[in-house]
């Protein structure tokens, strides 16, 4: 490796990876998945040197195991169970599950294939590696760091001056500039403001005594599309039922938009409204979404002021403050803010993702509330899923 190791701890990932993986470990160990990398920035070129470094970093990642103190920390999290922690004592990333290639034009391909309980863990580690290699080898890293610090200084000043009054969690490890910069940003936001309530990064939560924050991602709902016995338009129902059975109302913030929020609300019935403490927005108009969710709570006699609206879609602090001012007297409001915390520099950040695309050989997809966010390698399946969603919505409207 030309660079120092990027991932040095298997805790250096989002909490929701462990949350989802625990459900899979207890209920769905028979599922296998395939994940595919995509860079959404037009014209992004990865050089041969970058490609070689990415592979060397993946090789290093696959030498890591959980340390005793890391397992003890996971065991201390209220809803993480002892048998799952003991499984993680045995688990490690397996290099054979990851395939990489580079086209002559510099397009990077990464595919992860394996048992879902193992394959799903690679996503955040790989995104951290790709992002840091790209920015360290493409730009003058020290110059980027100077611009990042200047911007962070202004953000902290704005919190301390009273310009921003909302609370938020840092959700930035997947697209961070570097490990060292996310560490510095989280430390300073947590110690120099009163507004940063935690982080999704389990390693940094442990290091700084912060609250680790996260529930589940789109892939958790998507995986039910690959189970033969589950109708496609009812996957939210089965996902929430398994989640509640695992966590019994703890760790209860539901993601609404995997196959559209309108369909989600058909399964977010009175029982689920009571079982989950809130919902997360990740696509579409956040104001229209919030109004729709509040009306849904009122429909079932739940006081929206007792429920959490968690916004996490491409936020900066100005957008978050506007949403907070709009909803603060009508519901609990919080924010998960990622790239704006961990990779706000003089250069445009990469918009990179690694998405679940097949489960047990069957295509799966995310629709979301923003059409451009849909990602599926099988367009026939994507259209079939859209028709299934539309049929149920029309039948039950």
Q: Where do the PLM segments sit?
A:
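Ordered alpha/beta subdomains of enzyme catalytic regions
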Residues: 1-235, 244-245, 354-397
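Glycine-rich phosphate/ribose-binding loops and adjacent secondary-structure elements
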Residues: 3, 208-397
